[in-house]
C-alpha cells in the first residue's frame, strides 16, 4: 500500500512550524469555508494527496475561522397589545365639582333639562369647566331625575292601593255590623220569648160583644136579668161576694165547644130567678 500521503502531512506540519504562524493571509478564507457533517470516506485507491502549502492550508483556516455572531434577537417577541394601552389612556379622572359649580348647574337644570350647545358653553365658561364636562353632568342629572320620578310614582301607587284596601275593609266591617244589628241570629231568636197565643178565655171576660153576638131576640133580656140577679143576691154579703158570684156566672161549669157555651149553660140553669128579678 502507498502511505505517501502520511509523509506529505508531516511536511505540512514542518512548514507550519517554520512559518511560526506568521502569514495566514493566503490560507484564511472564512467566506469559502463550509462545514459539512457528512464527511466523505477516504478512497481506497487514488492519486496521492498534494503537498500542503501556505496557499491551501486547511488547518490555518480552521484556526483563523470565527463563527459569525448571531443576529440580535428582539427582547419582545410579540408586540404589546395596543388595546389595553389605549384604554388606559382613555380613562378619565372623575371631576369633583365645587359647591358654587353645583349651585349654578342646578339653577340651569331647574330652568331646562336639555340645554343647547350655546347655553352649555356659556355655563362652562362661567364655572370654569369644559363643555364636555357640563354635557356629561346634565346627562347624569337627567338620569337621576327620572329615577326619582319612578320611585315617587311607585310609592304613590302603593299608598293608593293601601288606602283602597283600608276603605274596602272598613265598608265590609260596617256591612257586617249592620247585618248583625238588623237581622236576628238563631241564638237571639231562641232567647226571645214566643208570642202569646190567642186565649179562648179572653172573650169570656169582656161582656161588650155579647149582645151583638147574640143578636136580636129574647135572649139578652134573661142574660141581663141573670147578671142583675147575681149582683142583687150578693149585695148583702159585700162587693167581694157579688164580684165572685158574677165571675162564677160567667165561667162555664163544663167546657163547651164555643166561646159562649158558659153563658148559655148558666142561662139554662137559672131561668127562673132571672125572670123574677128583672128590674126593667
UniProtKB/Swiss-Prot annotation:
Biological role stated in the UniProt entry: May be involved in regulating the specificity of expression of the catecholamine biosynthetic genes. Acts as a transcription activator/factor. Could maintain the noradrenergic phenotype.
One GO CC term on file: nucleus
SMART domains found in the cross-reference section: HOX (SM00389)
Region of interest (Disordered), ranges: 145-244, 260-280
The keyword Nucleus is annotated on this UniProt entry: yes
Record keywords: Activator, Developmental protein, DNA-binding, Homeobox, Nucleus, Transcription, Transcription regulation
InterPro entries: HD, Homeobox_CS, Homeodomain-like_sf, Paired_Homeobox_TFs
GO molecular function: DNA-binding transcription activator activity, RNA polymerase II-specific; RNA polymerase II transcription regulatory region sequence-specific DNA binding; sequence-specific double-stranded DNA binding
Any Pfam family: Homeodomain
Composition bias, Gly residues: 231-241
Gene name per UniProt: Phox2a
SUPFAM superfamilies hit by this protein: Homeodomain-like
Subcellular location: Nucleus
Domain of life: Eukaryota
Family: Belongs to the paired homeobox family.
The organism's taxonomic lineage, starting at the top: Eukaryota, Metazoa, Chordata, Craniata, Vertebrata
A biological process term (GO) from this entry: oculomotor nerve formation
Gene3D superfamilies: Homeodomain-like
DNA bind region: 90-149
Biased composition (Low complexity): 153-163, 199-215
Protein name, entry field: Paired mesoderm homeobox protein 2A
Organism: Mus musculus (Mouse)
